[in-house]
Amino acid sequence: MSFQAGDIVRIVACADDPRAVGKTGRVLDEVPPGPLTDYRWTVDRISIWIAPVLCHTHELRKEN
């Protein structure tokens, strides 16, 4: 599955910050992630207390 910038996603797992699991956020990346981020998507707007996180595709589910 691929995401687009602005997609709302639910974080089902997150090695970067386990506090983000179960929360929703917005994908920031305008292009598919590459080696610089270890092929992880940048997800923002999770919580005021949680900074943007990097998540692999299998850790995210697209919200409707």
Where would I find each of the regions flagged by the language model?
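Basic/aromatic-rich interaction segments and small domains that mediate binding to polyanionic partners
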Residues: 2-64
